[in-house]
């Protein structure tokens, strides 16, 4: 089956996305079961689902890395990307959407649209991905299909058009009305493979008629021929409805809504049928855009296996057995194993070791991947997320993906000295896999710092260090990097005299120290040789070393400049060391007179919240010593811009989630340093001592 050649029109590259716990992985499992890829269905709550293949995912029952899987249904090849629903992992969703042609959004029938659904939907809008919705968990207490459809319209402003209605709900959910065919499907067994196609039950004929009329009106909006027939009261065939629906979905004008219970195996085959009938093939989407690496001029590539190669590496993962895997979407051309490709972002040639198609965590080796296919490459050395692979004779750079800056950082150290190098290698590998994770060394404390998108994100990173890389480590509390500066222009003396038999030490200098906006500056204004030239650099060094630890709380001193204007020396006792000490003494004396103050990092914060929570959120920002800069409306929400001290932003993600019922999100980045109020300064000094 897998070796059969499929024409591009019979390819479907789709993502399955949802809020955490809407039943997305379960739905994917059922799809794999019905398409004959798995022989036993894995249950998420037993920790055995095929798609969730990292240990942490099986324990937590959530999906963290998006696994790309190939399966087959009704003579079509379907490539499915399972994406995580937790807010800390939106980067995975962002990457998946970049390489998909269509998406299935799964909602929980008792909750409808949830916060992460909104985030993912906005991301899909950016990439203009055609979508359909599967309302899952119809068998659960509180399941309400029509309420869920309502939330799609109200919260996402989607033109949601039901193609089905459930027969019964909760325990009595027994089948589905197909509004396109105008009949019903009643399930007869637990695996959902035995079903009866029958007439619509008598007690539901009226509501079915009402919703079928709404369906016909929606397709008439996108197809003029149907509009004419509809207005003239002519019969519209099932085929005509399907063709018009497909047209509406591809133009992002219609969002078809289906229902079922993946866990109870109801509605999944109908979902598969709809994916094939209404989701785009690689031929239906626009040719992929890119730029010529040297000239920067825009170019496109068609979805054609005979065209020059253009492929995008959208995820890097490390497999314990075969090493680095680069998950790749081929947009045009053909990639063959054992050949060379050109990485146009890095300007390097790379050799393709093997090409594999993934089924969750099982692999199938293939000789080639063609336009429209998704697969993983083994053997690439320099390729990272977002890189383009192409022919060096026909280079192209596909548009790069933009990833948010990390917003939280903590210090990390190995439990043993021997673990230091091992930890460094492991962190570099993890940073390569995940562009929203950063690692660096704090120059002031020498600590290794890891930064990421949220607390769960960093927890999972630390967890992977322990499990995959066998590095035991201690993790600190999130920290703020304070600085010190001066406010007054002062003069000060530094005099170091040491006489203890034999040769003594003598260094003496006078400096002026003044505040400045820029970097540290040292000016030598000594005239008449009161300090010999060879000792001047020693004074500069002494001042710079002393400035690494200020007099308020021992933080580095910034934004000052020094003018050396006088001093004296001794023919025998003067030395570089003596003048270095004199320089540091002059600096400390000057600082004690110059109104020294503590500075803290001020962050530029943007919060996106639905209007009804705005008052609460603004009040909370003010209570964090925030300064509101402005507000602008954006698609049913408000964007609040403010400057807030970093020390007040710890734990903000959790507060924002609870204040907005999870519907708000925010980004922050460092903007500038500013003076700390006296009361806070005293508190910081107290904590340092």
Curated annotation (Swiss-Prot):
One of its GO terms (molecular function) is translation release factor activity, codon nonspecific. One of its GO terms (biological process) is translational termination. GTP binds at residues 18-25, 82-86, 136-139. It comes from the Bacteria. SUPFAM superfamilies: EF-G C-terminal domain-like, P-loop containing nucleoside triphosphate hydrolases, Ribosomal protein S5 domain 2-like, Translation proteins. Keywords: Cytoplasm, Elongation factor, GTP-binding, Nucleotide-binding, Protein biosynthesis. It is found in: Cytoplasm. Residues 9-283 form the tr-type G domain. The keyword Nucleotide-binding applies. One of its GO terms (cellular component) is cytosol. Catalyzes the GTP-dependent ribosomal translocation step during translation elongation. During this step, the ribosome changes from the pre-translocational (PRE) to the post-translocational (POST) state as the newly formed A-site-bound peptidyl-tRNA and P-site-bound deacylated tRNA move to the P and E sites, respectively. Catalyzes the coordinated movement of the two tRNA molecules, the mRNA and conformational changes in the ribosome. Belongs to the TRAFAC class translation factor GTPase superfamily. Classic translation factor GTPase family. EF-G/EF-2 subfamily. PANTHER family: RIBOSOME-RELEASING FACTOR 2, MITOCHONDRIAL, TRANSLATION ELONGATION FACTOR G-RELATED. This is Elongation factor G.
């Amino acid at each position: 089956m897998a070796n059969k050649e499929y024409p591009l029109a019979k390819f479907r590259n789709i993502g399955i996305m949802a809020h955490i716990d809407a039943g997305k992985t379960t739905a994917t499992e059922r799809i794999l079961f019905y398409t004959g890829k798995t022989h036993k269905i894995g249950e998420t709550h037993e920790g055995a689902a095929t798609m969730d293949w990292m240990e942490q995912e099986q324990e937590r029952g959530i999906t963290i890395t998006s696994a790309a899987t190939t399966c087959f249904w009704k003579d079509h090849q379907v490539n499915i990307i399972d994406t995580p629903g937790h807010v800390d992992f939106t980067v995975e969703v962002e990457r998946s959407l970049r390489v998909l042609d269509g998406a299935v959004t799964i909602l929980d029938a008792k909750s409808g649209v949830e916060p992460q659904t909104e985030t993912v939907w906005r991301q899909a809008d950016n990439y203009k991905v055609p979508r359909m919705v599967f309302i899952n968990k119809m068998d659960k207490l509180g399941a309400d299909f029509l309420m869920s459809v309502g939330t799609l319209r109200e919260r996402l402003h989607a033109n949601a058009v039901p193609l089905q209605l459930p027969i019964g709900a909760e325990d009595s959910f027994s089948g589905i009305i197909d509004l396109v065919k105008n009949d019903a499907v009643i399930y007869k067994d637990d695996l959902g493979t035995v079903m009866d196609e029958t007439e619509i039950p008598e007690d539901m004929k009226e509501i079915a008629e009402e919703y079928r009329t709404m369906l016909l009106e929606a397709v008439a909006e996108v197809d003029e021929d149907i509009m004419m027939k509809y207005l003239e009261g002519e019969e519209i065939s099932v085929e005509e409805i399907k063709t018009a629906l497909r047209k509406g979905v591809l133009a992002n004008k219609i969002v078809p809504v289906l229902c079922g219970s993946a866990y109870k195996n109801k509605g999944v085959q109908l979902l598969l049928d709809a994916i094939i009938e209404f989701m785009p093939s690689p031929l239906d989407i626009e040719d992929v855009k890119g730029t010529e690496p040297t000239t920067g001029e825009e170019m496109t590539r068609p979805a054609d296996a005979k065209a020059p190669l253009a492929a995008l590496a959208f995820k890097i993962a490390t497999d314990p057995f075969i090493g680095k895997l680069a998950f790749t979407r081929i947009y045009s051309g053909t990639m063959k194993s054992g050949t060379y490709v050109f990485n146009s972002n890095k300007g390097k040639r790379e050799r393709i070791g093997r090409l594999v198609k993934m089924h969750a965590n099982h692999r199938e080796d293939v000789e080639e991947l063609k336009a429209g296919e998704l697969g993983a490459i083994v053997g690439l050395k320099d390729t990272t997320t977002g890189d383009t692979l192409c022919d060096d004779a026909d280079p192209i750079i596909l548009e790069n993906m933009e990833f948010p800056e990390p917003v939280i950082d903590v210090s990390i150290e190995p439990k043993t000295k021997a673990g230091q190098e091992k930890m460094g290698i492991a962190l570099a590998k993890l940073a390569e896999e995940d562009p929203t994770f950063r690692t660096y060394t704090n120059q002031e404390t020498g600590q290794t710092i890891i930064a990421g998108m949220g607390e769960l994100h960093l927890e999972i990173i630390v967890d992977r260090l322990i499990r995959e890389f066998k590095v035991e480590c201690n993790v600190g509390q999130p920290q703020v990097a304070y600085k010190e500066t001066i406010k007054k222009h002062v003069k000060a003396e530094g005099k170091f005299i040491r006489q203890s038999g034999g040769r003594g030490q003598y260094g003496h200098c006078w400096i002026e120290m003044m505040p400045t906006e820029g970097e540290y500056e040292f000016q030598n204004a000594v005239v008449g040789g009161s300090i010999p030239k060879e000792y001047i650099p020693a004074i500069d060094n002494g001042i710079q070393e002393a400035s690494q630890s200020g007099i308020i709380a021992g933080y580095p001193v910034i934004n000052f400049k020094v003018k050396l204007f006088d001093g004296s020396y001794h023919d025998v006792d003067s030395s570089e060391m003596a003048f270095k000490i004199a320089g540091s003494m002059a600096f400390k004396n000057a600082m004690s007179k110059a109104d020294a103050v503590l500075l803290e990092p001020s962050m530029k914060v943007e919060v996106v919240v639905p209007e009804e929570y705005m008052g609460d959120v603004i009040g909370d920002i003010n209570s964090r010593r925030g300064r509101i800069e402005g507000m602008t409306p954006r698609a049913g929400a408000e964007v609040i811009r403010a400057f807030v001290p970093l020390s007040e932003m710890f734990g903000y993600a959790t507060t924002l989630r609870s204040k907005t019922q999870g519907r708000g999100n925010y980004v922050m980045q460092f903007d500038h340093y500013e003076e700390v109020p006296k009361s806070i300064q005293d508190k910081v000094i107290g904590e340092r001592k």
